[in-house]
Amino acid sequence: MKLLKLVPDDTNIAFLKWRVPFFAISVLLIAASWALVFTKGLNYGVDFAGGLEVRATFTQTAEAPVGDLRDQVATLGYGDPVVQRFGEDNQVSIRVRLPDEVSADKEAAQAAANDIVETLQAEYDDFRLDGNDNVSGKVSGEFRQTALYALLAAMGAIALYIWVRFEWQFGVGALFALFHDVSLTLGMFALFQLEFSLQIIAAILAIIGYSLNDTIVIYDRIRENLKKYRKMEVPALLDLSVNETLARTVMTSLTLLVALLPLLLFGPASLFGMVAAITLGLFVGTYSSVYSAAPILVWLGVTSDSFVPRESAADEQEKKARGLV
C-alpha cells in the first residue's frame, strides 16, 4: 500500500526563476503595510490604549455567560468589550476601552466601573464583583514600549543565532523574512482595524517562531547541498534545496491550518484577532522563507566556498613552497 504523498519525490519547481518579481512584490507589500500603520494606525486594545478591567465571579452559575456579558456591556457605549473567562469557568474578566480623559481621571474611571457593575448586577443575581483596575494612558504606553522591545530583542537574537550557525548572509536573509512577516501582519491589523492587544504580540512571536523554523530547515538543506554539489550554480542549488524540503513545508503548513481554521471560523470573538494573525503568518511565513530568505543568498554572494574551512597563512605558504598554488 502506497502512502499518500502531497509532494512527489521528483518535484522540480524553479522557484528562483521568479525571484526578482516576487521579491519586488514583498518589498511593495512591506511598504504598503507600513503606510497603513502610519496613516490608519493600529486599533489598540485596553492593554495598549488604556481602559478599564472588571473582574467578577458568578456564585451560582457553572460557566460565566461570556457572550451575553459582551452584549450587555456593549449596550453601555464602551465600544467593543473584551470578555474572557479566567481561573475557574465561573470567573470572568471584562475589559473596555475608555477615552483618554476618562482613563486619566480616577473618579470618572471608577464611575464607569460602577456603571458596568450595576448594570450586570441588575441583570444577573449571582454576579459578584471581585475587583476592578484602571489602565491609564501612561501605563499602556509603557506596555507598547515593552512589547516593541520584546519584538526587537527576539529578532536581534534570531539574527545573531543564524549568523553564528550559518554565515552572515543567512542572518540577513532570515532577518528580512521575519521583518516581512511582522510587517504584513501589522498591515492586516491596520487595514481591517482589528483590535491590537497583548494577545497579538504573542501571535506575532508565534509567527516569528514558525517562520524561523521553516527558514532554518531550508537553510540547513542549502548548507548541506553547498558542500555536496560544489560545482552547481547557486540558484539551481537553492531550487533543489527548496524542492527537497517542500514536502515537509506543505505538511507542516496544512497541519497547522487544520487546527487554525475551526478556531478562525467558529471560535470565540475574543480569539479571532490572534487566530487571524497566526493564520496569516502561516502563509506569509512560508512565502518569505522561499521568496525572501532564499533569493537574498544569491544577491549576497553565497557560494560553496562559504562553508569550506579557511586555510591558515602557514598552510598557504607551505602550498606555495611546494608549488601547489
Give the predicted meaning of each segment.
Residues 1-325:
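A structural signal for conserved, well-ordered secondary-structure elements
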